[in-house]
Amino acid sequence: MSTLTKSDMIEHLMNHLNLTRQEGRCLVENFFDELSESLIDGKEVKLSGFGNFELKDKNSRPGRNPKTGEPVAVSARRVVTFKTGQKFRQQVDERLFDQ
C-alpha cells in the first residue's frame, strides 16, 4: 500500500486538467487552507459524496503513560473528526471487494 501526498494530487491535477505545477499547487493549497479556516471559524465542512469534517471538544480524563504505566491527566482539547459519506464509503468498499 502506498501513500497519496499533496505532490501526487498536484501531479494528478496537472495531468488531468492540463494545469501548470504552480496552478495545481495553488489549487491544492487553497483547498486545504479553506478547509482549515472553516474549521477554525467553527464551521462544519460538508463535502457532498465524500464526508464531513468537524471540530469536537474532548473532556479532560485520566490517562496512563504507556512507557511507565504512571497515571497522568489528559487535558481537555479540541480535535478534528472526519466521518465518511455513504457514497464515498460504498465506492471504496466496492473497489476493495473487486480486487
Swiss-Prot record:
Sorted UniProt keywords: DNA recombination, DNA-binding, Transcription, Transcription regulation, Translation regulation
GO molecular function: DNA binding; structural constituent of chromatin
Coiled coil (residue ranges): none
Keyword Transmembrane helix: no
Claim: Transcription regulation is one of the keywords in the record: yes
GO cellular component, one term: cytosol
UniProt xrefs under PROSITE patterns: HISTONE_LIKE (PS00045)
Subunit structure: Heterodimer of an alpha and a beta chain.
HAMAP family according to UniProt: IHF_alpha
PANTHER family linked to this entry: DNA-BINDING PROTEIN HU (PTHR33175), INTEGRATION HOST FACTOR SUBUNIT ALPHA (PTHR33175:SF2)
Family from the record: Belongs to the bacterial histone-like protein family.
Function: This protein is one of the two subunits of integration host factor, a specific DNA-binding protein that functions in genetic recombination as well as in transcriptional and translational control.
Protein name: Integration host factor subunit alpha
High-level lineage: Bacteria, Pseudomonadati, Pseudomonadota, Gammaproteobacteria, Moraxellales
